[in-house]
């Protein structure tokens, strides 16, 4: 295959400050983090998996599973607020436009899904209307995620399987 035009693939990485519990309520750099993350197409979540007395963890101990859950929950909490605002707006508009009933029903189901601690990317989509609502609501937990383990050099020489945090 000889294409007429060659376009190289480009990935731009944006380093966003870490997130802490309560970020969805504005704690730490929460609001700045959440606004920055809205601008990206996907999330690479770098998770600390190494122990070091020189680098203190914000929670006091290294626990990658806890850290992943903290971030996911903060994104979900932010999404619940976004989805609720959209539901309120759409429900008002529904009084004059009954064609919005499908959107209202989906938003209610989406909010219940989020309130169960599940990310928006895992909600069942039944039709184009629901997909459009999901795509246009700017939900953070709908973005694809890659988890990257930040490990010590020693872990790579001795084998990453021996790192208890990696296996978590």
What kind of feature is each model-predicted range?
Residues 89-168:
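C-terminal-of-GTPase-core extension/linker across diverse P-loop GTPases
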Residues 1-45, 50-65, 69, 125-137, ...:
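Switch II of P-loop NTPase G domains
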Residues 22, 55, 74, 86, ...:
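Active-site-proximal flexible loops/turns
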């Amino acid at each position: 295959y000889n294409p007429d035009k060659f376009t190289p693939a480009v990935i731009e990485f944006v380093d966003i400050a870490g997130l802490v519990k309560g970020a969805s309520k504005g704690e730490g750099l929460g609001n700045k983090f959440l606004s920055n993350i809205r601008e990206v197409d996907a999330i690479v979540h770098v998770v600390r998996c190494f122990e070091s007395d020189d680098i203190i963890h914000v929670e006091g101990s290294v626990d990658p599973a806890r850290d992943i859950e903290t971030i996911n929950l903060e994104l979900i909490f932010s999404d619940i607020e976004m989805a609720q605002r959209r539901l309120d707006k759409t429900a008002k508009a529904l009084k004059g436009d009954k064609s919005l009933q499908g959107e209202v029903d989906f938003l209610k189901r989406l909010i219940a899904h989020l309130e169960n601690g599940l990310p928006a990317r895992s909600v069942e989509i039944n039709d184009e209307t629901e997909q459009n609502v999901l795509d246009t609501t700017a939900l953070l937990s709908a973005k694809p995620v890659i988890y990257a383990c930040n490990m010590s050099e020693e872990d790579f020489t001795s084998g990453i399987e021996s790192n208890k945090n990696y296996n978590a």
